[in-house]
């Protein structure tokens, strides 16, 4: 298998529509929350099963805090298993509003989250990101032309 789309159960319907449109197989990531709110994730690769060279991870980043940890864990395990190319499909991209420090000590989350994504993924596709004082998504997520912002406006 060359490419696979991975998704979480709460986003199954849109992820499967995307997989069908792209002609890709899709599989769910198992997610368990422990009483202390830690997460246990399991990628859908069985013992002896071929690992795809490329994985598209579908994860919208609304209510982002747990989901950013999920990205970190999934990307780390996918790399450990031998996945060579990780692409993030995030219809909503969180933490893009805070693009400047208005007061001393304020965290510029856009820069930090953008660097985090670029560190773990070779590409990003999102829709209408909050880019207030910058012109292009690539300024926030340093992936060059592999950081793609689509418009949700009707054509």
Task: Give the residues covered by each predicted segment.
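PRPP-associated nucleotide enzymes
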Residues: 1-155
């Amino acid at each position: 298998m060359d490419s696979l789309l991975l998704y979480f159960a709460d986003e199954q319907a849109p992820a499967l529509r995307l997989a069908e449109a792209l002609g890709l197989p899709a599989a769910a990531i198992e997610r368990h929350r422990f009483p202390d709110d830690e997460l246990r994730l399991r990628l859908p690769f069985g013992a002896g099963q071929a690992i795809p060279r490329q994985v598209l991870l579908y994860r919208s980043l609304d209510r982002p805090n747990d989901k950013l940890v999920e990205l970190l864990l999934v990307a780390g395990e996918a790399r450990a298993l031998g996945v060579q190319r990780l692409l993030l499909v995030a219809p909503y991209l969180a933490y893009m509003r805070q693009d400047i420090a208005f007061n001393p000590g304020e965290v510029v989350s856009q820069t930090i989250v953008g660097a985090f994504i670029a560190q773990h993924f070779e590409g990003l596709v999102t829709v209408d990101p909050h880019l207030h004082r910058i012109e292009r998504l690539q300024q926030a997520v340093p992936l060059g032309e592999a950081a793609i912002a689509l418009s949700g406006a009707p054509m």
